[in-house]
Amino acid sequence: MLSVLSINYRYYLMELIDFSSSVWSIVPALLAIILAIATRRVLVSLSAGIIIGSLMLSDWQIGSAFNYLVKNVVSLVYADGEINSNMNIVLFLLLLGVLTALLTVSGSNRAFAEWAQSRIKGRRGAKLLAASLVFVTFIDDYFHSLAVGAIARPVTDRFKVSRAKLAYILDSTAAPMCVMMPVSSWGAYIITLIGGLLATYSITEYTPIGAFVAMSSMNFYAIFSIIMVFFVAYFSFDIASMVRHEKLALKNTEDQLEEETGTKGQVRNLILPILVLIIATVSMMIYTGAEALAADGKVFSVLGTFENTVVGTSLVVGGFCSIIISTLLIILDRQVSVPEYVRSWIVGIKSMSGAIAILFFAWTINKIVGDMQTGKYLSSLVSGNIPMQFLPVILFVLGAAMAFSTGTSWGTFGIMLPIAAAMAANAAPELLLPCLSAVMAGAVCGDHCSPVSDTTILSSTGAKCNHIDHVTTQLPYAATVATATSIGYIVVGFTYSGLAGFAATAVSLIVIIFAVKKR
């Protein structure tokens, strides 16, 4: 029998069914994911998962389910007496939509594409440009996907690179890079978790940041995902449905080209607003982080600022600053009329409505998945007598499954890192860091593939690509790297060597690529 779990919300108290020990906990997420891929109708699929999850948690009482769902939706906007931080992401999306429309109406997108066309040699150069920008924008995955999308999209469009390929490049260089960088929103969060785990198990041979760096070198999925992106960009390694999208783009039959205006734009009108966006966002991240450190009486440090930064607020400030600069440049050029300028705001806001709707639905189902305790159920699967040699690969697969079903890598970190540390510290201390690395890799892999993940949605948004097109074209590449990564972690489990695991992953990936190319 399923027990009853009491959850105390600020605005209401209701009894929810406890699915933490039941396979039924995965039903809402699994239903939404299967329907989304099968029907290609994301909102309908997410709605089905949301409704079924609400009914299951409410013991199939329609009135209770409706009340639960309404309160959850309200909490996305307003919670604990203040506006939810999620609204900053929504506002930033709207600002980015407006900025993109302003860049288009001013002719700067067209000017930048023409400028790049004279300097970038072919489609390969356009794809490599999009991939290389991660070395500038690695501070946050949201920021990377949206900012690089705005910069690279005019260029990839001009060279007839499909939007699906651009979305793949954005997504596969976002979280994989952020998760390995200490000076990023991801790195700061993970280092904080690691510090607590090292203290819990009295491990003194590593500092938290030292352990993080060592773990990053064994995060095979993240490392080889980035390598795969550059390989795909350089050699045009197209597989599965990506082949069709690239052919359509080359024939110019994909609905992807931005509307071009008759305005003779200038390259500076794109470069300056984007530079301001990057500089203002990073500066605000440092400021909000430093302010939080000061409030807690802590000494300023770069790592500390990124650990305590407020990403949403920083993105909004950066967005406003970039729009102000873009507007000033438009005024100076005197080529855009007031009605055209106003229309650009309307067009920009409308362009983000679909992405915002998907985000709200994804956030709602993520709340339901949390109340279903899907993560707790999946984590319970690692209990029992597991051969230590297979522990890293098991944790990788389980972390991927959890992040895929819940749509959150950070939530997976919070649940699985303590479990991995407990198992490894007690049974095989030599495998502690490899096991933690495997969890990080699995979380990024699952988040990377999940159609309900924020980062997947925002990568589609940044590329202005159909969301399910992005999911289905990226999945074969992610599965290829994940397969090679699994082999690498098996080797680590038997050899206790991160270098051996790295080599095994590299060799496996090469073999898989050659096997796929021969088909």
From Swiss-Prot:
Q: What is its main location?
A: membrane
| Keywords, in A-Z order | Cell membrane, Membrane, Transmembrane, Transmembrane helix
The protein's matches in Pfam families, at most eight in alphabetical order, are given as: Na_H_antiporter
Bilayer-crossing regions: 19-39, 42-62, 87-107, 128-148, 179-199, 220-240, 270-290, 311-331, 345-365, 386-406, 413-433, 475-495, 496-516
Q: Where in the cell is it found?
A: Cell membrane
Q: Which InterPro entries match?
A: Na/H_Antiport_NhaC-like_C
Q: Which Gene Ontology cellular component annotation is one that this UniProt entry carries?
A: plasma membrane
Q: Does the keyword Acyltransferase apply?
A: no
Q: What is this protein called?
A: Uncharacterized protein HI_1586
Task: Give the organism the record lists.
Answer: Haemophilus influenzae (strain ATCC 51907 / DSM 11121 / KW20 / Rd)
Q: What is the lineage of its organism?
A: Bacteria, Pseudomonadati, Pseudomonadota, Gammaproteobacteria, Pasteurellales
